[in-house]
Amino acid sequence: GRPGWHIECSAMARKHLGKTIDLHAGGQDLIFPHHENEIAQSECANGCTFSRYWMHNGFLNINNEKMSKSANNFFTVREIADKYGYEPIRYFMLTAGYRMPLNYTVELIESCKSSLERLYTCRDNLDFAIEHAHGTDTALAEKCEEARKKFKTAMDDDLNTPDALAAIFELVKDINTLSDASDKATLETAAKTFDELTGVLGLLYNRK
């Protein structure tokens, strides 16, 4: 039919976002012909770059098979969330780089839930440590700075979220090891760093 799918997207982007947009995303199966058509149409019509950055995500598989109704392995995000909550799903999506295929299994989503519980426990323990601080050590502050640098390096590497998570869990290990001996100011720095890094990934939003 007319108008076609490709021109519809170019028209909507120009109307609502302008001639040049910052970021365009979609599945890898849309690179050709859809996104190439969008670029050709928009740049010819507008005389400028259509999108500054492109993100093409990998596909989601279920137990190493493509999800489809015909294979009887189809379910919705809401169905998973009803059982596990939304945050484990978010964490699960962060366990692989966005360009990589992602394989869903019950075991993996349960592992993600357990990993989140470790993060919540660490953060709650930090609050307790701050309230009852009696140490004088400041070594944890240096570990916080190292975690920030590793996290930033990971995110600058094409949003390498697996390495970003690894940086957070390295900080968790340091907090668990050093918090009892740390002074209050250092513990507060650790809490701030922890909140900043997990916040970038949209994690721990259920903390009160």
Where do the protein language model's features map onto the residues?
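Alpha-helical recognition segments enriched in aromatics with Gly/Pro capping
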Residues: 1-127
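Structural preference for alpha-helix termini/caps and helix-kink/transition segments
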Residues: 66, 74-208
